């Protein structure tokens, strides 16, 4: 055999390496310029390999550092060189795909970029990136570890390319490093470094399912909360021991306070439909064809005449308007607002025209009678006890037309407070116009009955929080029209004091009369004193006809207004024998006594404020201040368990301060010594 030369074994190996370089170069260029179908080979690569492509890797000579065969060992080069894209051999293929240069503005690869936030591997890659940046500087030992971490699919693929299994590791490393160098040469906005990110519809569907599950859990939790709120906790209540009960009663706060609004009375019952109003045209003679058509029409068409304004053309500016038409319009004031507004406007214009068209000496205007006013209130839903109360003006057992039709079946839908207030406002304004235009239209008995009726109906529960300006103006006019004034004052005060049995309602009734005229001031003072005497059972001790004795009478009644005396006065029913209910009954009795004392003290303040305090009455007012402080202020023992006591004591303090201010303004003049008096 021929002797083998020392370098003869290197030529075939170099040729094989050159072929492998050419093959890997083509593969790397193919990976760079491939479309969406050709990027499947780059998908299994790990993120660490791609991160290493961006850092220059210092390598030993692959031939020196990886080959242990004695024939493959040649002269070693001591210097290290970086592995870069320039060191890779140029491929010999004539059709070389164009690679995008780093300086180009637009990419040559227009394939859609991957949506990185849809891939769940992004967070894992971001956590692993800092540790993998140092792969390029660890030398051959790191490359061996890197080669050992390659996926098994990639190893199997490169082993199939070469039949010699023993050279799989060098070829694999060399192919990997050349591919990394080609990826490092790609620009930042190309496909390099993002091979692991791709659109994943399964992840979107999974996220949608998770959101649906969260919404279902939230719905179930809300249902459980509703079920917890609807549980009957009384079944789980355990009776407290005496020690626990005493502890709870010691630190419990009572919710019973003195209400700022009066409770009211049930006056207007609900009606489903208003009572029918029929125009009595039997005595009317038509003066025109249009009027004859109106009088002969059914009630529904007559209302259409009113809404269309034809009645204004027929009866406006006429000297003698039919009384039956005025009565029909007055009853229509109780209908819903869309009808009552037109009726009120026409009725007002007709009365005003009558005032200006008739001469002063022969002026006669139509005014609704007391009975017609009661019928109007009955049409609004007022029941008979409110219209015909037991008292000085009891009218017997007469039943108004349509009274039998008012039953419980018709009381289903309560009338709206606003609609009721609008109808009452129309009635108040029209009555005020009549009282102002013709003061002598009503007698004193009718005036007092009308005042009582207005005060009684105004205490309705639905009207408590609504303003009553029109009512107050009407009451002032009715008081001024009473001819026997001060003779009717005692009778009027006694009548009004029985309008309600509740002290707070009577206090609200006193406040219906504004403190504006001398008659209203005197009525407020006398009525307040009568209500105080009635609540204390001392009606016989009041000389109502003597105005100057009101402060002295109030001084005697103030001593009976202490809470302890009121508690004894209200304790007509003995406490229940059960000891468990005795503390509760005692607390309710204390609240009632303080509530009554609060109303009586408010009425006492009205009595004093309506007086014209003179220097002669300075001593009586000073005595009232002393009794207020002695019988009420010092008798109230505040407690966190009884807020009504605190409210009563606050009112007593405010009243005392107000009376002290009056004392400073009406203090009598001091008598000074004059040595020249007897000269």
Curated annotation (Swiss-Prot):
Region feature (Disordered): 70-113
Pfam families (alphabetical): CANIN (PF14816)
Tree of life domain: Eukaryota
Disulphide bond pairs: none
Transmembrane stretches, start-end: none
InterPro entries linked: CANIN_dom, FAM178
Similarity-based family: Belongs to the FAM178 family.
Database matches in PANTHER family: PROTEIN FAM178B, SMC5-SMC6 COMPLEX LOCALIZATION FACTOR 2
Protein name as annotated: Protein FAM178B
Phylogenetic placement of the source organism: Eukaryota, Metazoa, Chordata, Craniata, Vertebrata
């Amino acid at each position: 055999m021929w002797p083998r030369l020392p370098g003869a074994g290197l030529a075939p190996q170099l040729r094989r390496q050159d072929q492998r370089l050419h093959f890997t170069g083509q593969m790397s260029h193919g990976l760079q310029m491939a479309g969406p179908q050709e990027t499947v080979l780059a998908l299994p690569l790990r993120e660490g390999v791609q991160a290493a492509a961006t850092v220059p890797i210092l390598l030993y000579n692959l031939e020196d550092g990886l080959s242990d065969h004695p024939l493959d060992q040649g002269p070693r080069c001591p210097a290290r060189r970086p592995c870069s894209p320039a060191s890779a051999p140029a491929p010999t293929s004539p059709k070389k795909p164009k690679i995008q240069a780093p300086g180009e503005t637009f990419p040559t690869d227009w394939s859609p970029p991957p949506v990185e936030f849809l891939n769940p591997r992004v967070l894992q890659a971001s956590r692993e990136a800092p540790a993998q940046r140092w792969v390029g500087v660890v030398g051959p030992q790191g490359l061996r570890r890197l080669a050992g971490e390659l996926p098994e699919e990639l190893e199997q693929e490169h082993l199939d390319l070469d039949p010699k299994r023993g050279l799989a590791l060098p070829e694999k490393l060399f192919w990997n490093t050349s591919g990394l160098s080609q990826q490092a040469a790609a620009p930042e906005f190309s496909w390099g470094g993002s091979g692991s990110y791709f659109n994943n519809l399964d992840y979107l569907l999974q996220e949608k399912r998770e959101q649906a599950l969260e919404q279902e859990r939230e719905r179930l939790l809300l249902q459980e909360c509703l079920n917890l709120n609807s549980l009957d906790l009384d079944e789980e209540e355990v009776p407290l021991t005496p020690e626990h009960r005493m502890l709870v009663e010691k630190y419990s706060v009572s919710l019973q306070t003195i209400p700022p609004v009066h409770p009211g009375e049930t006056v207007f019952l609900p009606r489903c439909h208003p009572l029918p109003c029929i125009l009595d045209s039997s005595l009317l003679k038509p003066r025109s064809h249009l009027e004859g058509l109106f009088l002969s029409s059914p009630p529904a068409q007559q209302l259409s005449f009113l809404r269309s304004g034809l009645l204004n053309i027929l009866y406006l500016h006429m000297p003698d308007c039919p009384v039956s038409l005025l009565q029909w319009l007055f009853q229509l004031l109780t209908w819903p607002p869309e009808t009552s507004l037109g009726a009120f406007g026409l009725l007002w214009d007709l009365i005003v025209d009558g005032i200006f068209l008739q001469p002063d000496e022969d002026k006669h205007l139509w005014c609704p009678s007391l009975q017609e006013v009661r019928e109007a209130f009955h049409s609004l839903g007022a029941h008979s006890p409110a219209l015909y109360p037991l008292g000085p003006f009891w009218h017997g057992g007469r039943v108004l037309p349509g009274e039998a039709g008012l039953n419980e079946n018709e009381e289903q839908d309560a009338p709206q407070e606003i609609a009721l207030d609008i109808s009452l406002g129309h009635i108040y304004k029209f009555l005020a116009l009549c009282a102002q235009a013709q003061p002598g239209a009503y007698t004193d008995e009718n005036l007092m009955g009308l005042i009582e009726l207005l005060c009684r109906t105004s205490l309705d529960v639905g009207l408590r929080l609504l303003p009553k300006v029109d009512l107050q103006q009407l009451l002032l006019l009715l008081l001024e029209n009473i001819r026997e004034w001060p003779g009717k004052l005692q009778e009027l005060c006694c009548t009004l004091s029985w309008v309600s049995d509740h002290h707070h309602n009577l206090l609200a009734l006193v406040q219906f009369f504004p403190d504006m005229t001398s008659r209203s001031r005197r009525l407020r003072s006398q009525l307040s004193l009568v209500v105080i005497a009635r609540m204390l059972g001392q009606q016989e001790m009041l000389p109502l006809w003597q105005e100057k004795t009101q402060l002295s009478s109030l001084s005697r009644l103030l001593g009976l207004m202490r809470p302890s005396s009121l508690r004894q006065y209200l304790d007509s029913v003995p406490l229940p024998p059960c000891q468990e209910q005795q503390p509760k009954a005692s607390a309710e009795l204390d609240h009632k006594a303080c509530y009554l004392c609060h109303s009586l003290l408010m009425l006492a303040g009205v009595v004093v404020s309506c007086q014209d305090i003179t220097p002669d009455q300075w001593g009586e007012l000073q005595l009232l201040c002393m009794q207020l402080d002695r019988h009420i202020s010092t008798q109230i023992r505040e407690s966190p368990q009884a807020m009504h006591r605190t409210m009563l004591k606050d009112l007593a303090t405010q009243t005392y301060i107000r009376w002290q201010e009056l004392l400073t303004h009406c203090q009598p003049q001091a008598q000074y010594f004059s040595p020249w008096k007897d000269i």
